[in-house]
């Protein structure tokens, strides 16, 4: 409540300590503010506890999980103020990168092709777009061939909810070396 009083209801909040996500969500639902996504984005990160949701019946089905979380957010007046990756970070990266490795071994994909990586991730997140680029050392300007920074388009919960389109944004190279 102090931060909302200080910064207002139009401020966006973020935390890197997962244990703080649930209480932050509860307070933002009560006092106002924005929460675009967690550091490990997922509809499972903080939302079920903050909203008092039992997701037993939806377990393993991220579209149903997101729908239930989104309905609860809208019901509590948080439409267009809360976001997440529609498909869990942990799940999609684990399953998607395993599929990418299999595709590489089967000769269907190139190991260091970002489009091939994104296509494998898409298999476990069918409605979300992906983007990324090779990591660039900000100090030296050297771009890594085998380390990617990847991200899923952010989903903003609402009535209706929508993807932000951030996976379609081309980041200018000049920003890769800001230090």
Which residues does each predicted region cover?
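A residue-level marker of the well-folded mature domains of exported/periplasmic proteins
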Residues: 1-179
